[in-house]
Amino acid sequence: MSYNTVQYLKTDPRARYQGYTFFFKEGLCWSDINTTFLKCRLKQKSINDVKSMSLYGLTSKVPEYYIICLINSTLMSYYVDNYVNNTQTFQINDARQLPIIVPSQDELDELRIIFEDAIRIKKSSNNAEELQTLQQRLDKTVDRIYSIK
């Protein structure tokens, strides 16, 4: 995107130029349309789009990788489907309704390892069996944080 294009979008009365303070910032995102199981990923520096919902961390107590792990957990998928929105869309206002528990440092460390393992597997082999095992580890960890037995 060129400087002239950005200037046009900022000044043209027909342009819908919103949220530009978040342009070219890393964060987390997910597709607007999903199945029962939500899938969230790290968002590279880019311009936001309505079909890929984006969020940005505001505090180190709840880092982006932690929120990504929560959204990717089976618990949050079931929570959203049963209590927030049982349609095929998961939008920003739905995400705002997620119950976020501030984790301990040990819990953050554990989820950071799971997060990094997921990226490594996706980049290297995309092995379905390894990913399934990692999903089970993630689910057990999130269930423990939320005191689900």
What residue ranges belong to the model's regions?
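Non-catalytic DNA-recognition/assembly elements of restriction-modification systems
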Residues: 102-149
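Polybasic, glycine- and aromatic-enriched phosphate-binding surface used to engage nucleic acids
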Residues: 1-109
